[in-house]
Amino acid sequence: MEFKLNIPNTIIKTLQTIVFFLFVLLAFQIAEAEIHHHTFKIKSKAYTRLCNTNKILTVNGEFPGPTLKAYRGDKLIVNVINNANYNITLHWHGARQIRNPWSDGPEYVTQCPIRPGESYVYRIDLKVEEGTIWWHAHSQWARATVHGAFIVYPKRGSSYPFPKPHREIPLILGEWWKKENIMHIPGKANKTGGEPAISDSYTINGQPGYLYPCSKPETFKITVVRGRRYLLRIINAVMDEELFFAIANHTLTVVAKDGFYLKHFKSDYLMITPGQSMDVLLHANQRPNHYFVAARAYSSAFGAGFDKTTTTAILQYKGDTLNRIKPILPYLPPYNRTEASTRFTNQFRSQRPVNVPVKINTRLLYAISVNLMNCSDDRPCTGPFGKRFSSSINNISFVNPSVDILRAYYRHIGGVFQEDFPRNPPTKFNYTGENLPFPTRFGTKVVVLDYNSSVELILQGTTVWASNIHPIHLHGYNFYVVGSGFGNFDRRKDPLRYNLVDPPEETTVGVPRNGWTAVRFVANNPGVWLLHCHIERHATWGMNTVFIVKDGPTKSSRMVKPPPDLPSC
């Protein structure tokens, strides 16, 4: 029996018209995407801060470096030419680099460094990114001065999910060492086993600000008009400290973090960790005057040294006639006020309900620790008890190989890494107690994930050796922060409190020193991806590990081939 479906010609023509217009719209969207070409020349340049001139690494002689701007859907091609005396790589922090780990940047993980006199072309395809992200060096300590903002506007024809601001202002929070050669800091610390040299100031857009010597005239100024709204794109590029941030007499509205929109909330201050970015609306609703924009450290570590200074910029109202009077300072929580930090971060919620992985087939628990190691010779080190500092994830202190892991994985080079990174702490113990019951081991170990695995990763902070919040960053992915708490993670009770409806989507999350954070993601981006603490001394000491995500079954789910100009090892 033959069945015929009789559809009126008018409906067929209507459907054909709809399909045609959808095709035209798709073609238009593809055509309007742009390719942006940039040249980044790495070179040393002398800068004067704090009454002293020091040579630093820069991109194109700028500190901070150039701001990259593009629209969602665009592509960037960045030719990096190394004219400096140090090896260099660059990382595009917050860009997923889908199927293209060759352009992700961490040295000896996805590439060998660009040597002096050589070059390498990075390719960034902004398929899903939107908002404020950033770029920075990912070799040695070069990111202290080699960094910049990366602004990804909504797709052309789209708009922000908040009132359009009158103006947008990137604010990069950084650090400055008065006399130290930044590139030599980790080597000096490694020789002694102690902590790296502490910075002499924090900076806002490269300037220490009003409260430091020889700095007042160059203090960064933000000019505003009363009644208008401004979008502040704030990036914490500081090497080693979380920061409290505030503007005197002004309430801030937080609208996004790490390039993902949030349910808007108001706060008199921010707490932002190294590696994080935040989009904040400022309503210039105060009487014309000039007000301090200020940031200083939040440090929950007991007994650890840190820069205790305060950096400032000035919010200047147009028409202010009181500019000879010292600006008003904002209230910032005390440096060790953990409840202030927790109160702020607990307000993060995705703007809308999100598709959180529910059926988990890969469960990982990573204990992250600062450790002490015995010195290798007869001389005592300068760490506590004459030992040297180290750090670890699941008791493994990561060691950079001599050939990058991605190349070794792709080309089947043996002896570079091992696939036996522990998926849980090798020995269970009281993670938030006062000591570690076993010594740390060194290794270059990875976890291999099947393509499309649904992963739950518990990041368990520890209390030992003056640890503070660990800002953990995962390359190649964003994840949902479904839960967080203090104490040891309880697998029976704590998941009952997860937020599986509208958890924030992030790329860098702060893990409490004596608590835990739970994140979930789908391993659908094949490649080799670094997971590490964004406190630079912790990463230098070994608080890193690597995920290898296998290729999927189709061409569109497999890694792209390596580029011809990949730096040699």
Curated annotation (Swiss-Prot):
PANTHER family: LACCASE-14, MULTI-COPPER OXIDASE. This is Laccase-14. Lignin degradation and detoxification of lignin-derived products. Expressed at low levels in flowers and siliques. Transmembrane segments: none annotated. The lineage of its organism: Eukaryota, Viridiplantae, Streptophyta, Embryophyta, Tracheophyta. Cu cation 1 binds at H91, H473. PROSITE patterns: MULTICOPPER_OXIDASE1, MULTICOPPER_OXIDASE2. Cu cation 2 binds at H93, H136, H534. GO terms for cellular component: apoplast. Glycans are attached at N87, N190, N249, N336, N374, N395, N430, N452. It comes from Arabidopsis thaliana (Mouse-ear cress).
